[in-house]
Each structure stands twice: as structure tokens, then as C-alpha cells.
Amino acid sequence: MLSVRTMCNGSFYLYITESKKMSKVAVTRVCLKDDYYLNAPDSVSNCEDAYLFIRNQIGFGTVERVMILCMDYDYHLIKCAIVSIGNDNKAVLDIGEIFKIALLLDAHHILIAHNHLGSSLIPTESDIQITQKIGYVGNILGISLIDSIIVNAGENYQSIRRYIMEREKKNGLDEHL
């Protein structure tokens, strides 16, 4: 028995079967769909390049949000996404979700950002630990973490990478992200 099916994109597939009964199986593709477009910097290789864009997206929020910026090999911004929306105190972050997006976009670099609702830009221990885990997993996958930053409605931001390095320098340690 010979069966030819044409797909919507013009390609076709061919079934060559004997007398065995065949059944249809759904084929699923995982892809990212653009929701809307924003004016964003062309390239992001450090926190300063991204700060105003990030602050305008999540800095004025009433709940904590976590955002990822994905860049190609030359630091050109590919896409950005909100990966978590929390409450007024915290946002739960799934590291797998971050890297699923980065891998689907073939990103070479990522920058993570989240907002604090109050005036404090000091990272919590949880902020530091999750940043270190993201950096570790990124190294394994070949995706560099440029930084993780905290923004609020104010005129400044906090680099968690810089905060960790300054804290370790103060404590006499050399380990970095």
C-alpha cells in the first residue's frame, strides 16, 4: 500500500506500508511566538546597555517580575521575555524555563533582570543563589550569563555579579560567578 500526503508548507511525506494497520500520530513542535514588539537596544554586552530598557519594562511594576534578554554570539539582542510574575514580595523562577527559551533562540549570552518594589536594590540571598545556579548551568550549556540585575522605579540598578565580587573581595575570597 502506498500513501502520499501533502503538508501545508508544500513538502510531502510518503508512507509505504504492508498490510499492517496504521494510525495517525500528532507531531508537536515547540516554538516561541512573538506577542508584541518593543523598542530595544540593538546590542547588549553589559548592564548599562540594557538598564533603561529593563527598567521601563519591569521597574515600575506592582509585583516582582523576572525578565530574560537573549543575545546572539555578537551580543545582538534576539528576544526578551518575562519568565516569571510573582507577588509584591517574590517571584518564583524556574531555571529550566530560562534555558528552554535561550536554547530555542540559539542564544549565546543571556542577561537576567528582576525588579524590587521598594527602594532597596540589595540582592537577597535567594537572588544570589539563583544567579549563581543560572551561571553554573549556563556554563555547562555554553550560554554565558552576562549578569543578573535588580531594578526599581529609581534611577539606578544593582549588578548581582558586581555585588558578589565586592562581597567576596571584602571577605577575602576570589570565586566569581
Predicted regions and their residues:
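Extended substrate/RNA-proximal surfaces in nucleic-acid metabolism proteins
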Residues: 45
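Mobile, glycine- and charge-enriched loop segments
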Residues: 50-56, 60-91
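Active-site-proximal loop/helix of nucleotide/amide-processing enzymes and allied scaffolds
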Residues: 2, 6-31, 36-39, 49-52, ...
